[in-house]
């Protein structure tokens, strides 16, 4: 059971660090994805747009006039990246604040292609998964051993960033819990005070009523 849990955790880590998928959108539609990213972490987004061809009843490489507008916002809702790219490309950005980063994509629709159906292939890579080590080895002339050491160092650095991010999330959750508990406590005290005041007022009112009726 423990081995199965560890395997599941490793699979989830891999899926979190590298995500490959495709989705269908119309040219007027906007699709957004949320990626939790530690601070100072590189994120690479590879995408390819295909256009639906009714004659072949399939998706073909998109026309030159179709591109993708990509917008990235950090956890503070600040725009990290916003520009128009071609129908196929590679986007890279580095996070400067930890938390959820929203990646939104929509086509630069034109009157000619408006309403067409698109299929977008998307691959999001985070951390050391975003590094092309073959290119690094060729550029820096690293041996196989040096490259392996470089990979291990990058993995350790990424694990440290992930741990720091988890501590940040725990601290934020604890702060939220403490704030919520404090509000619940004050609300309970306020309710108690209101009930006591209402009870006191009802007793005074009943006493005045009985005295007016000369029952006491």
Swiss-Prot record:
GO terms for biological process: dorsal/ventral pattern formation. GO terms for cellular component: endoplasmic reticulum membrane. Residues 204-216 are cytoplasmic. The chain crosses the membrane at residues 183-203. Residues 134-164 form a coiled coil. Residues 1-20 form the signal peptide. The gene is eca. SMART domains: EMP24_GP25L (SM01190). Residues 30-126 form the GOLD domain. A motif (Prevents secretion from ER) lies at residues 213-216. Belongs to the EMP24/GP25L family. It is found in: Endoplasmic reticulum membrane. This is Transmembrane emp24 domain-containing protein eca. Keywords: Coiled coil, Developmental protein, Endoplasmic reticulum, Membrane, Signal, Transmembrane, Transmembrane helix.
